[in-house]
Amino acid sequence: VTRRVLTTAWTLAWALLPVACAETSQERVQLALEVVGTEAAAPIEALDGVPVTLTRADLAFGPLYLCAGAQAGELCETARLEWLDTVVVDALSGTPQPAGELFGVSGVVQSWMYDLAISAQLTQEQPIVLDAAEALGGHSLVLEGTAVVSGITLPFRAEVPVQQTGATELGVPVVRKSTSDDFFHDVTGTEQALQVRFDPATWLAGVELRSYVQFETCGPEQTGVVCDGLVEWTCDPDGAHVSRDCSAASEVCIAGRGCAESVAIEPTSEAFRALRNALTSGARPEFVWVEGAE
């Protein structure tokens, strides 16, 4: 089922709603969608207790579909509620951010699915980069911050695109409620809003950052670059090793690279894979229904 098929099916269902409502007592529903981040009062922890302070955590979110059945994905032929737009979520802000309007019909919803602004369709060979991801340079997540490893403050940046892989159904949103997730709500139309709340601490919990800091000096006949804390060593097999203090240029020494302003978390790294897995199959965002005033 593609996003286009979902949308077409929903358009048809909307057109037939007067007839359907007479039979099922469903009503048209429109309510606000808000996205919310989490303000960290203290440094959060990456893998092995490494303290991390984030200065930026932008997530490209959407579209979002809420389904009647307990299992989302291709079993959700017609969404009960849907929001077809995208938004960049400031995941470090606890202030609700308006994202748009959810449209649909009343009734029970038991599952959800969403993309992170990179959407695959059966009719397209390549995933479509939607507005929010485009604003982040074609990525679903941009993280910036510092980690403290063995007393060394390590600036880092991660840019993570999240899109369909060969292991998922083509054309179906990439993040879906699992059978173990608790999600149930009877949509009545009295709701004021649905809030989707993200906590970036959950994305970093499995990210390994210690390996970027190294305490090593040149060995006999060794070549290449090694780091001894903040000191970069260029090793010479003849013993004419050359060192420089990275901190003198306000840089850090990154294992395997040498002096640099910050760590760029590469797509081939374990840290990158951990971030992507956290977004697709890790801790879920919290869905909070805000009831309207009586």
Kindly label every feature range from the protein language model.
Residues 1-12:
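Bacterial N-terminal signal peptides that target proteins for export
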Residues 2-3, 243, 256, 275:
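Short, intrinsically disordered low-complexity segments
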Residues 5, 205-210, 228-230:
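Generic secretory/membrane-interface signal
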Residues 11, 54, 236:
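Short, flexible active-site loop motifs that bind/organize anionic cofactors or intermediates
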Residues 11-14, 113:
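Detector for methionine-enriched segments
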Residues 17-20:
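C-terminal motif of bacterial Sec signal peptides marking the signal peptidase cleavage site
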Residues 22-219, 260-294:
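A short, solvent-exposed, low-complexity linear motif enriched for acidic/polar residues
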Residues 218-260:
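Cysteine-rich, disulfide-bonded extracellular modules and peptides in secreted proteins
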